[in-house]
Amino acid sequence: MVSLIDQNQLDSFIEKNPSWIIDNKTIKKEFKFDNFIDAFGFMSKVALLSEKMDHHPDWQNTYNKVTIELTTHDMGGITTNDIKLAESIDQLINT
């Protein structure tokens, strides 16, 4: 079951993943790549992952940069699904 995370859980996530920032009721991260093709390839991987998890990011792409914001709109904030997706996205980068 999806639930909003509390401040302690959010602080713990940010401590372990300092490249993600809290922005209002979202967690946000900017990814930089060598070029547009690499950025778009990353977005394709995230799209497949998101579809599999049935949880989708808000994102923006400008040339070699991809900004991802995660929140659960119908819950009104950051949930366990957002944390799981953020961790899974980071694993894509680290593999």
Q: What feature does the model see in each segment?
A:
Residues 29-35, 68-73:
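Alpha-helical scaffold segments that form or flank carboxylate-/histidine-based iron centers
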Residues 44-47, 87:
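Solvent-exposed alpha-helix faces
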Residues 22, 47-57, 94-95:
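Short arginine-rich
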